[in-house]
Amino acid sequence: IYTAQLTDWSEVGGEPGPIQPFQRNPDSGSQTLFMKLLMRGKQPMTPPTELVQQTMGGLIDGVAAFDGSGSALGYSVYYYASLMYGNPNLKLLAVDGVAPSNESIGNQSYPLTNDFYLVIRADEPADSPVRALRDWLLTDEGKRLLEEENYVWARAGMPQQSAGAGNPFESSSLPG
């Protein structure tokens, strides 16, 4: 769709009608994720100016309100689209039959996820603020706060810690 090879909803199992693919501006974080997770090295088509949105909220509202026909398509970060901003006229689509949810993102059955890591130097002093924050985030209280904020622990919910020989960093996989 975003390479303009498919331009009509009937080509993807929908009712006949043109697909209106909204995009973000090239410098946005969601556009960067779109390029990484969906385009995978392919170049997207140049969209009409009115389909390029400067904010995630603008994209969500633009897709939800576009001419009332349901012909618009867009992308956003799950957390933002469903929990922070939201729009009752927006429908989140399944990918390969898997709908986005905290559960499907956490168990990685939803294919479009992005991991976040907290990385600190292995030689970071034990009393440093960054080590204190990392250690606190890995406590039950820290995990509970992250879950309350709707971050999702990946890989069966367990943070990963590693520091190998010659590796000057310690890392902890945080929910993404």
Where are the language model's segments positioned?
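Flexible loop/hinge segments at secondary-structure junctions
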Residues: I1-G176
